[in-house]
Regions:
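Glycine-rich beta-strand-centered segment in the early N-terminal region that forms part
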Residues: 34-51, 63-105
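Residue-level marker of beta-strand positions
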Residues: 96-97, 111, 153, 173, ...
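Glycine/proline-rich active-site loop of Rossmann-fold NAD(P)-dependent oxidoreductases
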Residues: 303-308
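NAD(P)H dinucleotide-binding glycine-rich loop of Rossmann-like/cofactor-binding domains
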Residues: 100-158
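Short amphipathic alpha-helix with an adjacent loop that forms part of the alpha/beta core around
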Residues: 204-214
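Glycine-rich phosphate-binding loop and adjacent beta-alpha segment
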Residues: 191, 222-284, 291, 313-327
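Mid-domain Rossmann-like dinucleotide-binding core that forms the NAD(H)/NADP(H) cofactor-binding site
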Residues: 132-201
Length: 327
């Protein structure tokens, strides 16, 4: 019996973050929960790092409701080491380094179950890998819905965060010219990613037209800042606009709201390695936190202007990776 298999047998409780009522970051607590075990097609990983996403603090506040009751666990983006596999799993083995999306939204924990996963690219450590899954899937899905490809000019509203930063680089890799909105402080960062920056806020549309007098072919709204009418005008109609953040505005202006219910793009997890190894993709991690500081991580994610991602580092010694870097 190897060490990973032994670890999975002797443990029966894990540390995990959860909330028992809706509210601010203070409702989060670290509790002991029974170890999960994978079903058919699933794997279990010892979580080394877990990303923080806006969806998680919106669920915590009660702004989103996916039908789960209370208490709720939290966390979707995870990276770690496989320590148990379910029936029918042949693509990974115990000891492999993987990243992906927690099946039950319980990634901020010592153990997590995954169906959608991929090997961590060789040059990435766990922290950088944990920043990627949701941003990759969401950005890829949105670009696919807009048919972004070579020569298709794209405007992204809200570009400096994790999804926006990811969408810029994926669009540029497809050969699309990109204009991105962000604060002036982030303009150099957007140029580094490959986008032409414009400042958001009043007069944004006029500033975009100085770069694209005839408008753009497509527009992606990541920020949900009430600019859908301007994006529709710049992109030549609502059919050329997708929003990730303005559900009510999408209904009002007949714009597509992309939520993932229409289909996922988890194939992006397996495809990103080539761009990373070629030096064509990079998603910065602005800050890391230990699991017991998840409340502060949520506070910064909710109220701060984060460039890239925030990531929890899980102090796990359940298994050690058999291959690849250990960062």
């Amino acid at each position: 019996m190897n060490g990973a298999q032994l670890a999975s047998k002797v443990r029966n409780m894990m540390k995990a973050a959860q909330f028992s009522r809706f509210g601010g970051p203070e409702v989060l607590e670290i509790v002991n929960l029974p170890d999960p075990h994978p079903g058919p097609g699933q794997i279990r990983i010892a979580v080394h790092a877990a990303g923080i996403n806006a969806t998680e603090w919106k669920l915590r506040k009660g702004e989103l409701n996916f039908g789960a009751g209370l208490p709720q666990t939290t966390g979707r983006d995870v990276a770690g080491v496989v320590d148990e596999v379910g029936e029918g799993v042949t693509d990974v083995a115990v000891g492999d380094r993987v990243f992906g999306v927690s099946d039950d939204g319980a990634g901020a924990a010592e153990l997590a179950l995954l169906t959608f996963r991929a090997p961590i690219p060789p040059s990435l450590g766990f922290v950088d890998a944990a920043a990627l899954p949701v941003a990759l899937e969401t950005a890829t899905r949105s670009l696919d819905e807009l048919s972004v490809g070579r020569g298709i000019s794209l405007l992204i509203n809200g570009t400096a965060g994790g999804i926006g930063s990811t969408a810029v680089q994926l669009a540029v890799a497809r050969g699309a010219p990109v204009i991105g909105t962000a604060s002036t402080a982030n303009h150099d960062y957007l140029r580094l990613l490959g986008a032409e920056p414009v400042t958001y806020g009043e007069g944004m549309a006029e500033r975009v037209r100085t770069l694209a007098p005839d408008g753009v072919d497509a527009a992606l709204d990541v920020a949900g800042s009430g600019v859908l009418p301007e994006l529709i005008d710049l992109a030549g109609g609502p059919k050329n606009v997708v929003t990730l953040a303005d559900f009510d505005g999408a209904k009002q202006h007949e714009v597509r709201f992309s939520s993932g219910y229409q289909g996922h793009a988890f194939h992006a997890l397996n495809e990103i390695g080539a761009l990373i190894e070629a030096g064509l993709f990079w998603l910065p991690v602005e800050r890391t936190y230990p699991l017991d500081e998840i409340s502060e991580a949520h506070r910064v994610s909710e109220h701060g202007h984060v460039r890239g991602r925030l990531v929890l580092v899980i102090d796990t010694r359940i298994v050690k990776p058999e291959r690849g870097p250990r960062g």
